């Protein structure tokens, strides 16, 4: 019941995805052959959200892995949980997208997309009542961004009423892999605004900062970064996989978090984040979790929530705790920081409680916020985009694959509209008089 189909694309998506499955397998007591070796019935109760039970009692992830080159997938296959995936669900090309969105979306990716869709269809038919899809990808490269968004739009056509959740790694301001990241990201956001229901926004720089500042890691690796992401991903979906007092699913999440359809880009955070050495010295209490969870340093994307206002937010607590205390703490945060919440959506913070904590912790919490400050990130990418596009730098790589300059202009203006929309709601107040005055002004202007 209520299955989620997981799709990972490109190098980044496959690496995050592989880590995510390690965490999920751990939580459900599944070893790397797919056999159950856990000790609690709760692990099996709703295991079919992410796993399909095959013959001989093996649990197979409902995962589709795609890439335009075989490299990353080979390393997933030879990784610790590589043998658990269905071999047919690895779909890869040979040519690579070369960090080019157009290759992923129009040429190389378009050739491979039908075989990916076949696998998606097969997995969807295996579901009792498919709830939705979750896609892991990055927006800076070619495959995850170009082919990822192509797949999302195709799935949208075929399954229009299912939820589409993405975990999208945005290019970060200082840590850049390729010079054309702003192009790829802007073209992708253009697609995500229209075709995705909820986007969890991640970025490497914020993750580096967390590893460096909070976790005190001297040289954080991508493995450490992906571990943070997978903890969050596991937290977002724990309500679906374990029983709890206040449950939520992808659709409830969307209903509570999205006041306007285009504004579905969320900041995520996770608590407790403690460095490995100091873990045992900290007593975890609900107030502590709540405090750390709302801390700007905990956000996994490079935007500061104190520069904007929260439209809505949702918190998922895990572990044995009192629901009453959770509610009190959440109210407490809202009352103390009321200026950071828009006053025209009362009770805009939702919490859910799930009884089973992550491995190795007594309690934990995952935070998802819809904050207007995320426009900082779009603004930054947009500025970099405009700087290059004004000079038509690197454009021939894209036009050579059959793209039109018009498409760039459209993507650019869509991104700018999105920023303007966030700004509009950040400035909006609850007083009626303002609206009447505004309307009069508009009439005069007209």
UniProtKB/Swiss-Prot annotation:
GTP binds at residues 11, 69, 138, 142-144, 204, 226. Mg(2+) binds at residue 69. It comes from the Eukaryota. Transmembrane segments: none annotated. Keywords: Cytoplasm, Cytoskeleton, GTP-binding, Magnesium, Metal-binding, Microtubule, Nucleotide-binding. Pfam families: Tubulin, Tubulin_C. Expressed in roots, second node, leaf sheaths, and suspension cultured cells. This is Tubulin beta-3 chain. It comes from Oryza sativa subsp. japonica.
């Amino acid at each position: 019941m209520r299955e989620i189909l997981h799709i990972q694309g490109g190098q980044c998506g496959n690496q995050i995805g592989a880590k995510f499955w390690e965490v999920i397998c751990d939580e459900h007591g599944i070893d790397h052959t797919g056999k159950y070796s856990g000790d609690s019935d709760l692990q099996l109760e709703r295991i079919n959200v992410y796993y399909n039970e095959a013959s001989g009692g093996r649990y197979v992830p409902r995962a589709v892995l795609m890439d335009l080159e075989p490299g990353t997938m080979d390393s997933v296959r030879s990784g610790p949980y590589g043998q658990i995936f269905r071999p047919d669900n690895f779909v890869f090309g040979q040519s690579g997208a070369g960090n080019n969105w157009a290759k992923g979306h129009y040429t190389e990716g378009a050739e491979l997309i039908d075989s990916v869709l076949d696998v998606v269809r097969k997995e969807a038919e295996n579901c009792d009542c498919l709830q939705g899809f979750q896609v892991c990808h990055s927006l800076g490269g070619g495959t995850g961004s170009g082919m990822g968004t192509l797949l999302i739009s195709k799935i949208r056509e075929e399954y229009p009423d299912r939820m589409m959740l993405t975990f999208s790694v945005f290019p970060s301001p200082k840590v850049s892999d390729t010079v054309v990241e702003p192009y790829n990201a802007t073209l992708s956001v253009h697609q995500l605004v229209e075709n995705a229901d909820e986007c969890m926004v991640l970025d490497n720089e914020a993750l580096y900062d967390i590893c460096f500042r909070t976790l005190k890691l001297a040289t954080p690796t991508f493995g450490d970064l992906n571990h943070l992401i997978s903890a969050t991903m596991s937290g977002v979906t724990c309500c679906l996989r374990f029983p709890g007092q206040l449950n939520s699913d992808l659709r409830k999440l969307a209903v509570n978090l999205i006041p306007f359809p285009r504004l579905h880009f969320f900041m995520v955070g996770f608590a407790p984040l403690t460095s490995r050495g100091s873990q045992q010295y900290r007593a975890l209490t609900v107030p502590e979790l709540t405090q750390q969870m709302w801390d700007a340093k905990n956000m996994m994307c490079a935007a500061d929530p104190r520069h904007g206002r929260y439209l809505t937010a949702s918190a998922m607590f895990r572990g044995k705790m009192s629901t009453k205390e959770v509610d009190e703490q959440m109210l407490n945060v809202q009352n103390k920081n009321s200026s950071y919440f828009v006053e025209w959506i009362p009770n805009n913070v939702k919490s859910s409680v799930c009884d089973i904590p992550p491995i190795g912790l007594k309690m934990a919490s995952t935070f998802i916020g819809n904050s207007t400050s995320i426009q900082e990130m779009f603004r930054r990418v947009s500025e970099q985009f405009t700087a290059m596009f004004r000079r038509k730098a690197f454009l021939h790589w894209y036009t050579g694959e059959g793209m039109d300059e018009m498409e760039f202009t459209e993507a650019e203006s869509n991104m700018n509209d999105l920023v303007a929309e966030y700004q509009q709601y950040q400035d909006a107040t609850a007083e009626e008089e303002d609206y009447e005055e505004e309307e009069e002004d508009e009439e005069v202007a007209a």
